């Protein structure tokens, strides 16, 4: 196990955001346990297995918009340094080092993606994301690597692909992300495990 960071302000954070009502109330983790490791693993497994609830992120246009938002908020707005991410049908995992307060970082992402997703899905303006989230501060290098792999292997664990690189809406993807239409274009280049670099053009965001 590596040495812990000395300064909490530069610590990476493992975040999970899920869709509103993506888990039945009776099976959602209690509020006071949602940052507990065992509770998180159980909840994450349920998110991959649950047969009810919204799966809006399964829609390609919505998933691509969310990926774009993750990169835009990192590379253009500078809210965080993005290390790894995956967009699953009903939740998002990311590993990032925040440059702003975590509540502000989360609120900015959820606000713009909720607005865009509701428009893409032709849904009435309503809560899109579950209000509470899971977050864990990463203090050791070994833990950083484990979480990075955990995130990128999520589609494999869920039986969606055989190899992590086959899943398009993930930092593991070997494909460039090209959004349909003339409005958006992004070419993503995965670097070493220090961040996510890209060449980005995003008009009318």
Model-derived regions, located:
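Short catalytic/metal-binding and nucleic-acid-binding patches
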Residues: 1-205
């Amino acid at each position: 196990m590596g040495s812990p960071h000395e300064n909490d302000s530069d610590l990476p954070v493992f975040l999970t955001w899920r869709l509103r009502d993506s888990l039945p109330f009776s099976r959602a983790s209690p509020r006071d346990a949602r940052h507990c490791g065992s509770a998180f693993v159980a909840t994450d497994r349920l998110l991959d297995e649950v047969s009810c609830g919204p799966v809006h992120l399964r829609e390609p246009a919505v998933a691509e918009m969310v990926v774009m938002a993750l990169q835009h908020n990192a590379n253009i707005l500078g809210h965080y340094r993005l290390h790894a991410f995956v967009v699953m049908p009903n939740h998002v995992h990311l590993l990032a080092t925040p440059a702003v307060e975590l509540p502000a970082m989360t609120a900015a992402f959820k606000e713009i993606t909720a607005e865009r997703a509701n428009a893409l899905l032709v849904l009435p303006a309503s809560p899109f994301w579950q209000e509470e989230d899971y977050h864990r501060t990463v203090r050791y290098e070994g833990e950083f690597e484990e979480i990075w792999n955990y995130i990128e292997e999520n589609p494999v664990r869920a039986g969606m692909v055989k190899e992590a690189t086959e899943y398009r809406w993930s930092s593991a993807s070997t494909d460039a992300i090209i959004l349909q239409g003339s409005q958006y274009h992004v070419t993503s280049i995965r670097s070493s495990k220090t961040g996510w670099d890209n060449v980005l053009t995003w008009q009318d965001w």
